[in-house]
UniProtKB/Swiss-Prot annotation:
Any GO CC annotation of this UniProt entry: nucleus
One of the GO BP terms on file: heterochromatin formation
Protein name in the entry: N-alpha-acetyltransferase 40
Keyword Transferase: yes
Domain N-acetyltransferase: 88-274
Site (Essential for catalytic activity): 186
Species of provenance: Saccharomyces cerevisiae (strain ATCC 204508 / S288c) (Baker's yeast)
């Protein structure tokens, strides 16, 4: 994964088209969602500080302040047990929520815009601009956004959902077994804050070791964490694998390369046939 640790976690669209959105069943029990939000407030740091040096060797300190916004289910518009000052309901604060989502999609554009423009029609199954599709996806009920701001500028964010997913359990290549999982959609760090381990800290320590392991205690048959990643994002894949993620049983598999004959000289060219994306998962028994 790149140093900004961006992750192309497009669940419904990357798995061929938008049909996967209906395939994924969100965990809609309000008490569990409340507890899940409280875990996010508890496990993600309220601020992240890092130091840099300028060309003269002088140290500067950046402090990123946390903001959490969630897209509620229809039956969880009011969640009394969650501190509204620390966790904002998108439906109750739509103006602010739209500002946050717009900043998030702009950061995604800087990192992955070219990929989305090339693959949008395949991913979303329509001809709309990829940003329009992405913003609609980003408003899916159940999504949680943990954002970090540097004086009003988005420095980093991650988004994820407590849901159910198939194709993760060993032997379930046909997507017949559904298990609770945290599905990671995005992890992005702005260029001004790269190189300080922020993305890894959010993914490994806050989400996996923090939120996911504690979710395991409250959710029967909880599997762990899953995500999707573009197949050509080798840096992202190396990081995920270093953290213990592996290609899920139901993930598209690498295809055998094809051999094409050149038009002149009778030569041959080996053409790789990787899928558009892979599904990675981290099991937490």
């Amino acid at each position: 994964m790149r140093s900004s640790v961006y992750s192309e976690n497009t669940y419904n669209c990357i798995r061929t088209s938008k049909e996967h959105l209906t395939e994924r069943r969100r965990v809609a029990m309000a008490p569990m969602f409340q507890h899940f939000l409280n875990l996010c407030v508890e496990k993600f740091p309220e601020s992240i500080e890092h130091k840099d040096t300028d060309g003269n060797g002088n140290f500067t300190t950046a402090i990123l302040e946390r903001e959490i916004i969630y897209i509620p289910e229809d039956d969880t518009d009011s969640i009394d047990s969650v501190d509204s000052l620390k966790c904002i309901n998108y439906k109750l604060h739509k103006s602010r929520g739209d500002q946050v989502l717009d900043a998030c999609v702009q950061l995604i554009d800087k990192h992955l815009g070219a990929k989305y423009r090339r693959a949008s029609r395949i991913m979303y199954g329509n001809r709309k601009p990829w940003k329009a599709n992405k913003l609609a996806e980003m408003k899916s009920a159940g999504l949680v956004y943990v954002c970090y701001w540097d004086n009003g500028v988005l420095g980093a964010f991650t988004s994820f959902m407590l849901t159910e997913e198939t194709g993760l359990v060993e032997g379930d290549a046909l997507h017949e077994v559904s298990v609770p999982v945290i599905y990671l959609y995005e992890v992005h760090v702005a260029s001004a804050h790269r190189g300080h381990g922020i993305g890894r800290r959010l993914l490994e320590h806050a989400l996996c070791d923090g939120v996911a392991r504690h979710t395991r205690r409250m959710c029967d048959n909880f599997f762990g964490v899953a995500l999707t990643v573009f197949s050509d994002n080798t840096r992202a894949r190396r990081l995920y694998e270093a953290l213990g993620f592996y290609r899920a049983p139901g993930s598209p598999a690498p295809a055998s390369p094809t051999i094409r004959h050149t038009r002149h000289g009778g030569g041959r060219v080996v053409v790789p046939c990787d899928p558009l994306y892979y599904v990675y998962c981290l099991h937490m028994p």
